[in-house]
Design a protein with these regions (language model features):
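Juxtamembrane helix-loop-helix connectors linking adjacent transmembrane helices
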Residues: 59-75, 91-158, 169, 173
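Membrane-interface helix/loop boundary segments of multi-pass membrane proteins
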Residues: 158-182, 211-218
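Membrane-interface helix caps and helix-loop-helix hairpins in membrane proteins
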Residues: 131-134, 189-197
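Hydrophobic alpha-helical transmembrane segments
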Residues: 37-42, 110-115, 145-149, 177-185, ...
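Hydrophobic cores of alpha-helical transmembrane segments in multi-pass inner/ER membrane proteins
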Residues: 79-90, 151-157, 219-221
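N-terminal, membrane-interfacial amphipathic/helix-forming hydrophobic leader that caps
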Residues: 1-99, 234-242
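Functionally important transmembrane alpha-helices
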Residues: 181, 190, 198-242
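Aromatic-anchored segments of alpha-helical transmembrane domains
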Residues: 45-54, 118-127, 184-193, 227-238
Length: 242
């Protein structure tokens, strides 16, 4: 195999043909909108906003102490970012969740591309973790390594689903690959308040994760990559309690 053929195979994504229901529109004040895609975009944006403001969901509402910290946030995001869109897919859309990335997908390419990404990103993350802004943000005590992995796996896999699963695949079937850029907007919005270099890096990192989900048809590989990057950052910044 040549380099060109390997590249062509690695970047050849599957087709995402819309179903009859995907193609249905709704007219609002004379404006014709794609019903599912518009609903997914509005809901995903509203859920991110609720998470950022914590307007409706508080630790107390979840039965957790007010100082529950990262675990409270992870449980909240599981509810907002996983349970709510899953319920919408099943109950409102009456659709198969596998069409929205809840499957293994093309696992050979997913695993291979994930490993390649890990090799590239590991030295970059370790280098960034030594910077004062990153050490101040990620070096705060975050718990033991198993606690950190469990907490951020719950949180980040849920976040992957709402943006690069539910939203991405709903948009893909109506607006095509432009969806990979549209999902960047709420993703970047959710990172406001983090170190500035990380905020700008989400333009690249988020696009790569969206592309990976498009290529594999799954949120699994981007989710695992996201968890690895964040846990490595916390470890390298000194946030793990021994």
């Amino acid at each position: 195999m040549t380099t060109a053929s390997i590249y062509a195979a690695a970047t050849r994504g599957p087709a995402y043909p819309p179903s009859e229901t995907d193609l249905r529109d709704i007219v609002v004040a004379g404006v014709v909108l794609p019903r599912r895609a518009a609903a997914a975009l509005l809901l995903a944006t509203a859920l991110v906003l609720l998470d950022v403001t914590r307007t409706l969901v508080t630790p107390e509402l979840l039965g957790l102490p007010a100082d529950a910290g990262a675990m409270a946030r992870a449980v909240q995001r599981f509810g907002l970012f996983f349970a709510v869109p899953l319920a919408v897919i099943v109950l409102a859309f009456r659709d198969d969740p596998r069409r929205y990335g809840l499957r293994i997908g093309e696992w050979r390419w997913g695993a291979g591309l994930l490993v390649a990404g890990v090799v590239v990103m590991t030295p970059i993350i370790v280098s960034l973790a030594s910077q004062p802004d990153f050490r101040a943000y990620y070096g705060r005590p975050a718990g033991s390594l198993p606690e950190v992995v469990a907490t951020y796996a719950l949180e980040l896999l849920s976040a992957e689903f709402v943006l690069r699963g539910f939203l991405l695949f709903a948009l893909l079937r109506r607006v095509g690959p432009l969806a990979l850029l549209v999902v960047q907007v709420p993703f970047i919005f959710a990172h406001i308040g983090k170190p500035e270099p990380e905020l700008w890096s989400t333009f690249f990192g988020g696009a790569v994760f969206a592309w990976l989900n498009w290529r594999t048809g799954s949120i699994v590989w981007s989710g695992l990559g996201h968890v690895y990057i964040l846990v490595l950052m916390i470890v390298a910044a000194g946030g793990i309690r021994s």
